[in-house]
């Protein structure tokens, strides 16, 4: 069966964490959560990633988005490793919880397993990141191999896109950033678009003359 992906409800797992017991649905509450895995504590790329998450925590907080990490190491390991993360990026504080999944059952349910990375206990997590909405449904997923660290600017951009799309019923084009034009969904007629977007919209003049590429500001 395919693993957890966009449109699926995230499992309501309860795990130990650096902040005590966490039940995922309770943690999500009525907001958005970035649920992300890392292959292992005390490893180089993971240290830079979780430090970057700490640096960007305020950006996510401003958007009403919480962070929640997970790996197969135990809670005590997470706590000890946090000292290294904060020393690597002075001034950064790891304020978000990191869950422990020593038996690796949670990462399987969350579709966070890297089939190519293993240790003596079994398969390790990939660098997976799910953005979970208030309805507990996965809205977006990133999946990176162990050799490639994630780009936090792109994670922020993706969050901004999801929040904008949800609020204004639009979509965002390639390389979009907040303040730039968005596109109107194909299922919205021109008449509906005039009511939805009284500020107006522009239709790209394309060879097909189909009028499907419409831009507006929100």
UniProtKB/Swiss-Prot annotation:
One of its GO terms (molecular function) is thioredoxin-dependent peroxiredoxin activity. It is found in: Nucleus; Cytoplasm. Residues 4-164 form the Thioredoxin domain. The active site is a conserved redox-active cysteine residue, the peroxidatic cysteine (C(P)), which makes the nucleophilic attack on the peroxide substrate. The peroxide oxidizes the C(P)-SH to cysteine sulfenic acid (C(P)-SOH), which then reacts with another cysteine residue, the resolving cysteine (C(R)), to form a disulfide bridge. The disulfide is subsequently reduced by an appropriate electron donor to complete the catalytic cycle. In this 1-Cys peroxiredoxin, no C(R) is present and C(P) instead forms a disulfide with a cysteine from another protein or with a small thiol molecule. A motif (Bipartite nuclear localization signal) lies at residues 194-217. It catalyses: a hydroperoxide + [thioredoxin]-dithiol = an alcohol + [thioredoxin]-disulfide + H2O. SUPFAM superfamilies: Thioredoxin-like. The keyword Oxidoreductase applies. GO terms for cellular component: cytosol; mitochondrion; nucleus. This is 1-Cys peroxiredoxin PER1. Signal peptide: none annotated. Belongs to the peroxiredoxin family. Prx6 subfamily. Thiol-specific peroxidase that catalyzes the reduction of hydrogen peroxide and organic hydroperoxides to water and alcohols, respectively. Seems to contribute to the inhibition of germination during stress. It comes from Hordeum vulgare (Barley).
């Amino acid at each position: 069966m395919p693993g957890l992906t966009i449109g699926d409800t995230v499992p309501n797992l309860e795990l130990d964490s650096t902040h005590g017991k966490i039940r995922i649905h309770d943690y999500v509450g009525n907001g958005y959560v970035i649920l992300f895995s890392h292959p292992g504590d005390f490893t180089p790329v993971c240290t830079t990633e979780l430090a970057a998450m700490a640096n960007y925590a305020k950006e996510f907080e401003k958007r009403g988005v919480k962070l929640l990490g997970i790996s197969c190491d135990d809670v005590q390991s997470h706590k000890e490793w946090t000292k290294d993360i904060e020393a690597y990026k002075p001034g950064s504080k790891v304020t978000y919880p990191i869950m422990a999944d020593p038996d690796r059952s949670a990462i399987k349910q969350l579709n966070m397993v890297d089939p190519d990375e293993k240790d003596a206990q079994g398969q390790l997590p990939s660098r997976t990141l799910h953005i979970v909405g208030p309805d507990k449904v996965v809205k977006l997923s990133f999946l990176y191999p162990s050799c490639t660290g994630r780009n936090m600017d792109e994670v922020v951009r993706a969050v901004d896109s999801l929040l904008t799309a949800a609020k204004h019923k639009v979509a965002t084009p390639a390389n979009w950033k907040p303040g730039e034009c968005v596109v109107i969904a194909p299922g919205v007629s021109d008449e509906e678009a005039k009511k939805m977007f009284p500020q107006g919209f522009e239709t790209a003049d394309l060879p097909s003359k189909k009028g499907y590429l419409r831009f507006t500001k929100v």
